[in-house]
C-alpha cells in the first residue's frame, strides 16, 4: 500500500488502557509457559494499531509542522503517551510476576525478560512529577538553542545556518562564524549553567527515589543496556584513550598535510580537503535511481526492500518550508512498512542520511516479515540498532560512485575518517556525564575545567586559540544529548566499533561481510549487543586489547587512501 493510501484513525485511549488492564491480569495468571508466550505475542499485537496511528501522525506533523490538523493529533499523542507507557510497564510487571516467566527467555532469547525488568526498574509513579519537571527543563534548553539568531555577513542566521561559513575556505570567515555562535552562548551563559545544575539535580533525585546512588547508575537501566554496565564502558573508554587517540593524532597530522594548514586551530577542523568537500550528484530522481541500482546489486534482500520502499512512497527526504529538521526512520507495524524522513541540503550528508536510515529501515523490513519476532522486539537497544545503520553506510561503499561520480574517493576518505575520529569525542562526552552526575556539587567553572581536561585526554590535537565560549571549556553545552538525553552518546561509539569492523571485513571479502551483517540483522531485537557482535564474528570492544588492532588497521587504510 502506498503511503498516501494509508488511513489514519485517532485511537480510543480508554479502550486501549482497558485492554492493557485485561492483558496484565491474564499475564499474571497464565497457567503455563506456552500460554505466556502466546499472550506475549497477543499484547505485542495489541499495540500495533496504536503505534501505527501515533507514527502516522508524527510523520505527517514533521513533514509539515504548520498543518493544524496534524499538530492537534501530535498533541494528542504527546498528552496520552505517558499513560500508555505506564500501562505497558504494568503489563511487563505482570509478566515478570508469573512463575513461568522463564518460558519467555527460552522462546525469545535474553532481551525479552531483561528488557521488561529494565522497564519496571526504571519507571515508578513516584518519579512522574520529576519526569514532567525534567521535560520542562529540556524544553527551556531547546528554546534557548532553537531560538538562536546571530548576526553575520549582514544577515540574521540560526546556528545550523552558520554551517557553510564554518566550512568556508577563508580562515577569517570561519573564525567570524565561530565567534558569532560563541557570542550567543556566552550571552546565555547563566541560563545554560543554571539549567544544567537543575537537570543533574532532577535526574539524581529520580535515581535516588528508585534506589540508585545517582543517575549514572539509573541511566544503564533506562537505556536498556543488557549484559554490561559502567565497568565495561569504562574499560572501553580506557582503550580509546590509550590505543585510539595516538592513532587519531597520526590521522589529524595527515589531514593537516592534506589541507595545507600546518598548525590547525579549532576553527580549521571543518576543512577536510583543500578544494572543498565531496558533492553528491544533483536531483532527487537521479539519486533515487542510483539508490535502487545500488540496493539491487548489493543483494536480493536489499533489492526487494528498496523496491518496496520506493514503490510505496516511503521516503520523504527533500527539504522544504514547514518541514522539521533532522532525519529518522520509523515503523508502521500495521502495514509492515518502514518510513524514512530526511532533509537533503546538497552536501555529502545527503548520502550519509540515505544509507544510514536505509540501514535502520532494512532491519525493520526484515524483522516485520519474521513471524517469530513480536512487534515490540523488532528492534534492539540503541547501541545495537545503530549498527544496522552505520554498517550500511560502509557496506554500500562499492556503489558510492553512482551517487558521487568523480568525488567518490574523497567521500570514502571523508566518511571513514569522520567515523574513526568521532570515537574520541563520543568517549569524552560519556566520561564527562559520569563525572557530572557523580559529582553534582561542581560549580559551572569546575564543570568547564573538567571538560577541558577531557579535551586534552581525548582530543589533544585541538588548539582553541583563545576562542570565546569554547576556550573556557563550555563547548559541551552545544551538545544537545548532554541536556536532552543524558548517557545516550556512548551508543554511537559502541555501534561505530561494529561498523568499522564491517568496513575492514568488507575490504577483505565484501560478500562475507554482507552475510555476517545479514545474520546480525536477522536476530532483530532478540539479542543483546554482545550477542549480536558474536553472531557476526566481531570483536566485543569491552575486552582488553580488542580496540587496538581495529584502530591500527583504520590508520593504515586512511594513510593509503589520502587524496
Place the predicted regions along the sequence by residue.
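A well-structured
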Residues: 1-278
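C-terminal, non-catalytic "cap/extension" segments appended to globular domains
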Residues: 110, 115-117, 227, 318, ...
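Zn2+-dependent metallopeptidase catalytic core
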Residues: 237-251, 280-307
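Post-HExxH zinc-binding segment in Zn-dependent metallohydrolases
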Residues: 242-243, 368, 379-407, 421, ...
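Long, K/E/R/D-enriched contiguous segments that form extended
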Residues: 261-290, 420-422, 427
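Short pre-active-site segment immediately N-terminal to the catalytic Zn-binding motif
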Residues: 280-284, 335-355
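Catalytic Zn2+-binding segment of zinc metalloproteases
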Residues: 359-374, 395
Amino acid at each position: 500500500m502506498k503511503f498516501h493510501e494509508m488511513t489514519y484513525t485517532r485511537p480510543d485511549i480508554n479502550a486501549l488502557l482497558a485492554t492493557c488492564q485485561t492483558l496484565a491480569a491474564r499475564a499474571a495468571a497464565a497457567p503455563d509457559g506456552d500460554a505466556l508466550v502466546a499472550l506475549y505475542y497477543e499484547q505485542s499485537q495489541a499495540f500495533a494499531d496504536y503505534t501505527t496511528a501515533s507514527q502516522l501522525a508524527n510523520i505527517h506533523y514533521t513533514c509539515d509542522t504548520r498543518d493544524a490538523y496534524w499538530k492537534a493529533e501530535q498533541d494528542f499523542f504527546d498528552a496520552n503517551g505517558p499513560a500508555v507507557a505506564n500501562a505497558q510497564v504494568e503489563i511487563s510487571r505482570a509478566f515478570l510476576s508469573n512463575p513461568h516467566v522463564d518460558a519467555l527467555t527460552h522462546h525469545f532469547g535474553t532481551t525479552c525478560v531483561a528488557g521488561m525488568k529494565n522497564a519496571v526498574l526504571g519507571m515508578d509513579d513516584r518519579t512522574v512529577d520529576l519526569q514532567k519537571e525534567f521535560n520542562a527543563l529540556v524544553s527551556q534548553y531547546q528554546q534557548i538553542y532553537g531560538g538562536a539568531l546571530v548576526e553575520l555577513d549582514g544577515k540574521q542566521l540560526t546556528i545550523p545556518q552558520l554551517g557553510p561559513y564554518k566550512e568556508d575556505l577563508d580562515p577569517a570567515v570561519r573564525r567570524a562564524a565561530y565567534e558569532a555562535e560563541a557570542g550567543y552562548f556566552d550571552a546565555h551563559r547563566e541560563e545554560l549553567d543554571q539549567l544544567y545544575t537543575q537537570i543533574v539535580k532532577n535526574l539524581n533525585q529520580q535515581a535516588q527515589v528508585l534506589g540508585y546512588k545517582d543517575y549514572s547508575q539509573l541511566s544503564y537501566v533506562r537505556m536498556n543496556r543488557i549484559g554490561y554496565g559502567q565497568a565495561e564502558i569504562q574499560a572501553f573508554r580506557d582503550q580509546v584513550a590509550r590505543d585510539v587517540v595516538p592513532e587519531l593524532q597520526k590521522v589529524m597530522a595527515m589531514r593537516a598535510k592534506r589541507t595545507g594548514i600546518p598548525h590547525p586551530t579549532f576553527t580549521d577542523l571543518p576543512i577536510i580537503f583543500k578544494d572543498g568537500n565531496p558533492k553528491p550528484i544533483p536531483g532527487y530522481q537521479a539519486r533515487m535511481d542510483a539508490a535502487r541500482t545500488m540496493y539491487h546489486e548489493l543483494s536480493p534482500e536489499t533489492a526487494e526492500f528498496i523496491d518496496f520502499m520506493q514503490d510505496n512512497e516511503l521516503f520523504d527526504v527533500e527539504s522544504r518550508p514547514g518541514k522539521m529538521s533532522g532525519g529518522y526512520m520509523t515503523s508502521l507495524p500495521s502495514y509492515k512498512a518502514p518510513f524514512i524522513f530526511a532533509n537533503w541540503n546538497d552536501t555529502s550528508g545527503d548520502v550519509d542520511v540515505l544509507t544510514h536510515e536505509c540501514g535502520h529501515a532494512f532491519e525493520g523490513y526484515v524483522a516485520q516479515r519474521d513471524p517469530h519476532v513480536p512487534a515490540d522486539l523488532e528492534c534492539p537497544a540503541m547501541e545495537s540498532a545503530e549498527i544496522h545503520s552505520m554498517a550500511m553506510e560502509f557496506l554500500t561503499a562499492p556503489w558510492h560512485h553512482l551517487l558521487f561520480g568523480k568525488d567518490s574517493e574523497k567521500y570514502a576518505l571523508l566518511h571513514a575518517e569522520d567515523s574513526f575520529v568521532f570515537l574520541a569525542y563520543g568517549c569524552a562526552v560519556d566520561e564527562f556525564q559520569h563525572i557530572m552526575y557523580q559529582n553534582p556539587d561542581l560549580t559551572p567553572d569546575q564543570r568547564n575545567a573538567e571538560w577541558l581536561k577531557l579535551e586534552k585526554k581525548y582530543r589533544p590535537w585541538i588548539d582553541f586559540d583563545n576562542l570565546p565560549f569554547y576556550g573556557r571549556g563550555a563547548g559541551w553545552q552545544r551538545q544537545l544529548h548532554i541536556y536532552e538525553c543524558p548517557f545516550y552518546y556512548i551508543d554511537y561509539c559502541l555501534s561505530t566499533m561494529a561498523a568499522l569492523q564491517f568496513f575492514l571485513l568488507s575490504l577483505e571479502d565484501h560478500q562475507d561481510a554482507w552475510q555476517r551483517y545479514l545474520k546480525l540483522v536477522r536476530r532483530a531485537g532478540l539479542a543483546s549487543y554482545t550477542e549480536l557482535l558474536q553472531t557476526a564474528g566481531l570483536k566485543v570492544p569491552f575486552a582488553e586489547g580488542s580496540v587496538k588492532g581495529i584502530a591500527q588497521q583504520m590508520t593504515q587504510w586512511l594513510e593509503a587512501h589520502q587524496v
